[in-house]
Regions:
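A short beta-loop-alpha structural element at the N-terminal edge
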Residues: 4-18, 27
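Helix-loop element at the rim of GNAT/NAT acetyltransferase active sites that forms part
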Residues: 18-38, 51
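A short helix-loop-beta-strand connector motif used in the catalytic cores of GNAT acetyltransferases and
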Residues: 44-64, 122-126
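Conserved beta-hairpin
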Residues: 59-75, 133
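Conserved acyl-donor/pantetheine-binding loop and adjacent beta-alpha core of acyl/acetyltransferases
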Residues: 74-131, 137, 147, 184-190
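Conserved GNAT acetyl-CoA-binding A-motif
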Residues: 123-125, 152-165
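Conserved beta-strand-loop-alpha-helix junction that forms the acyl-donor binding cleft
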Residues: 128-137, 160-170, 186-192, 197-198
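Conserved active-site alpha-helix within GNAT-family acetyltransferase domains
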Residues: 143, 155-157, 166-183, 188-189
Length: 211
């Protein structure tokens, strides 16, 4: 099965959002925000569709890995200097009707704390979202999606940053990221980490067809 990476197009929004909904269905952050599994699985695709819309409006760069006509994984990057515009923030507000009212205060507090911790300086590529369809997880899709972009960072001598739940910290450490700030979500929510990656010497561009 030949896998390849390409830039996402607008028509990928639906399939990619559905994929991300499946990928994050059991993620501790979303379990914390939407504890009811049925509601969570029903509403996450809409949440991610809004996020992908923000990415499209904001000039973010979204990579998808495909095979046999299917999207296996999706990575959303915010380029150096990008910042949400008023329009993007309004689009982001469209996600909140998808949060159960009983969890609205928790969701607002949680995402405010994570957003406040998001790195701003120095300039960097920010990994906004990375998800792999569950049947393709642990088959190299996530690493394959990130490797070309990180090689591009190395070549350009650019930093990269992200925010991750604790379970994924070792994966990102293996790619050169270092945890620099612990985010303790109030109310005993899931711990997250701000992670930075400095460019590695001798970086070379990696082809986007991965196997």
């Amino acid at each position: 099965m030949h896998r390849f990476i390409r830039p996402a197009v607008l028509s990928d929004t639906g399939p990619a959002a559905a994929l991300l909904g499946r990928a994050f269905a059991d993620d501790r952050l979303y379990v914390w925000v939407i504890p009811d599994e049925h509601v969570r699985r029903q509403r996450l695709p809409g949440l991610f569709a809004a996020q992908l819309g923000i990415a499209h409006l904001g000039g973010f760069e979204t990579d998808v890995m495909c095979a046999d006509g299917q999207i296996l994984g999706c990575a959303v990057w915010s380029p150096p200097g990008a910042s949400p515009s008023v329009l993007q923030q309004l689009v982001g507000l469209a996600t909140f009707p998808l949060i159960p009212w009983s969890r609205m205060a928790v969701a607002l507090s949680t995402f405010h704390q994570i957003g406040r911790a998001r790195p701003k300086e120095p300039p960097h590529w920010y990994l906004s979202c990375l998800g792999v369809d569950p049947p393709a997880q642990r088959t190299g899709v996530a690493r394959g999606l990130l490797t070309p972009r990180l090689a591009q960072c190395d070549e350009a001598r650019a930093r990269a940053a992200l925010i991750s739940g604790g379970a994924n910290v070792p994966f990102y450490e293996a790619l050169g990221f270092t945890a620099t700030l612990k985010i303790n979500i109030s109310g005993n929510g899931p711990t997250h980490w701000v992670m930075w990656r400095n460019p590695r010497p001798g970086g070379k561009r990696v082809r986007r067809g991965v196997d």
